[in-house]
């Protein structure tokens, strides 16, 4: 299959009049679209077997072929593709029949370049929105990434999670970055009796102690500089539901006594307001840090840890559940080629072997990112090793002993590893000890 060099959409023009094809093509290519032309139903069918199109302009009078029959076949072959019927004034009634049969719209010949451009932009926008909606609906219907597993250890964890979800016990989820701790937390909320209420997330590393207290418990107007309005806080938002404290190991030590008190008594005060309030909240927390080591070094309260880990679930790294790698890769590929309307339909044997041999330090998050990138840049039906962008990395993700690496190569490898295990660029910049603008420049420099 050919790769689209333009970034706005693939368009198929089907008309038996070469002058119309030429005029439409020049107009649309001037707008930056990728355009293919066919002068018969058979030629259109051949093109559609080789390429993925987002939009088709189909002449209703196509020589010996009936445009309505061609439309029906297109709807079967490429149900996602928007089809605009092109017709003469005398055949408007038939064009209306075509819309009832599944066409998106119709244009009356002769049409102006502005009419063609407007119709194209409108239909491609609808196509993009439909793709995003389908992706979201698929996310709702299907098991979340990494939670549909063939790994015995993962299946045992999921079974335990389902059993404890129906209780109100606090749960601590442990695991490396990218293993799906947040998804498991949201799944537990969905399996619980609190599912109809909110599941509110706080990302602990992103907030200072001062901001964390305000974000968690709320504040009154004038409580501090810039507090022009009162806020209710995440605890209030989660009342009756679940509060998920992501990366709890980064929760400010000075604020841990207030969190402990809330977990024990369900009581809290907003910043700048002495009134004691209550909230019925179930606590889920997750971290990739060793909290017991942090307790021993005085960086985390032992009594808070005991309150958080009534139930502990430890998610295995992706390399420890290798039987799920290809299943997840296939699922990600199917999702992204649908979302981006790309031609890839599977992986070559070499690519599948590379996926299995890689250690995935960034776990499921890294796998998802690798497959998303591959789905975008792959111009054919099979994803090759070169599309994955990780073929030359050694299995242990460390520089080879004795390898002559430049400082730039070392820096690139280090930044790439941090990016793979960070949820946001800000978090990656913080880990690297540089500001976001410097990280942006380095990513551009190293093509990361």
Swiss-Prot record:
Stored SUPFAM superfamilies: CheY-like (SSF52172), Homeodomain-like (SSF46689), P-loop containing nucleoside triphosphate hydrolases (SSF52540)
Give the GO biological process terms: alginic acid biosynthetic process; phosphorelay signal transduction system; regulation of DNA-templated transcription
Q: Which domain of life is it from?
A: Bacteria
User: Which PANTHER family does the record match to this protein?
Assistant: ALGINATE BIOSYNTHESIS TRANSCRIPTIONAL REGULATORY PROTEIN ALGB, TRANSCRIPTIONAL REGULATORY PROTEIN
Q: What is this protein called?
A: Alginate biosynthesis transcriptional regulatory protein AlgB
Q: Which residues form the Response regulatory domain?
A: 10-124
- Residues recorded as binding ATP, renumbered to this chain, are 175-182, 238-247
Domain Sigma-54 factor interaction as annotated: residue spans: 147-376
Give me the positions annotated for DNA binding: 425-444
List the InterPro entries hit by this protein, alphabetically: AAA+_ATPase (IPR003593), CheY-like_superfamily (IPR011006), Homeodomain-like_sf (IPR009057), HTH_Fis (IPR002197), P-loop_NTPase (IPR027417), Sig_transdc_resp-reg_receiver (IPR001789), Sigma_54_int (IPR002078), Sigma_54_int_dom_ATP-bd_1 (IPR025662)
User: 4-aspartylphosphate modification sites?
Assistant: 59
- Keyword presence, ATP-binding: yes
The disulfide bridges present are none
- Role of this protein: Positive regulator of the alginate biosynthetic gene algD.
Q: Which classification does the entry list for the species?
A: Bacteria, Pseudomonadati, Pseudomonadota, Gammaproteobacteria, Pseudomonadales
């Amino acid at each position: 299959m050919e790769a689209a060099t333009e970034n706005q959409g693939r368009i198929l023009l089907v008309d038996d009049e070469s002058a119309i094809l030429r005029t439409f093509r020049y107009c649309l290519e001037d707008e930056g679209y990728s355009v293919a032309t066919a002068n018969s139903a058979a030629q259109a069918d051949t093109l559609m077997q080789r390429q993925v199109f987002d939009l088709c302009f189909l002449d209703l009078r196509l020589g010996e072929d009936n445009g309505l029959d061609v439309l029906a076949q297109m709807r079967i072959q490429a149900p996602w593709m928007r089809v605009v019927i092109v017709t003469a004034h005398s055949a408007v009634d038939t064009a209306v029949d075509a819309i009832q049969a599944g066409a998106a719209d119709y244009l009356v010949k002769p049409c102006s370049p502005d009419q063609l451009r407007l119709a194209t932009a409108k239909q491609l926008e609808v196509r993009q929105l439909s793709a995003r909606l389908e992706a979201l609906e698929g996310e709702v219907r299907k098991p979340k990434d990494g939670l549909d597993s063939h790994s015995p250890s993962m299946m045992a964890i999921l079974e335990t999670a389902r059993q404890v979800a129906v209780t109100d016990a606090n749960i601590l989820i442990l695991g490396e970055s990218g293993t799906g701790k947040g998804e498991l937390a949201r799944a537990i909320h969905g399996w619980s009796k609190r599912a109809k209420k909110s599941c509110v997330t706080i990302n602990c590393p992103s907030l200072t102690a001062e901001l964390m207290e305000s974000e968690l418990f709320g504040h009154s107007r004038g409580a501090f500089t810039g507090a022009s309005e009162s806020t209710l806080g995440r605890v209030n938002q989660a009342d009756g539901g679940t509060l998920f404290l992501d990366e709890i190991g980064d929760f400010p030590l000075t604020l841990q006594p207030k969190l402990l008190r809330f977990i024990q008594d369900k009581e809290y005060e907003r910043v700048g307001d002495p009134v004691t309030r209550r909230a019925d909240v179930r606590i889920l927390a997750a971290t990739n840090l060793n909290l017991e080591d942090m307790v021993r070094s005085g960086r985390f309260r032992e009594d808070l840890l005991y309150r958080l880990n009534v139930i502990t679930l430890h998610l295995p790294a992706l390399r420890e559940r290798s039987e799920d790698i290809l299943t997840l890769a296939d699922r990600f590929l199917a999702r992204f080629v649908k979302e981006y309307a790309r031609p890839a339909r599977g992986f070559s044997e070499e690519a599948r072997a590379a996926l299995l041999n890689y250690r995935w330090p960034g776990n499921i998050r890294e796998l998802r990112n690798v497959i998303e990138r591959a789905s975008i840049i792959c111009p054919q039906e099979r994803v090759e090793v070169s599309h994955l962008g990780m073929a030359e990395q050694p299995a242990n993700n460390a520089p080879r002993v004795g390898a002559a690496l430049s400082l730039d190569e070392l820096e690139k490898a280090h930044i790439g590893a941090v990016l793979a295990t960070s949820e946001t660029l800000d978090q990656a910049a913080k880990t690297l000890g540089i500001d976001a603008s410097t990280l942006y420049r380095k990513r551009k420099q190293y093509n990361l």
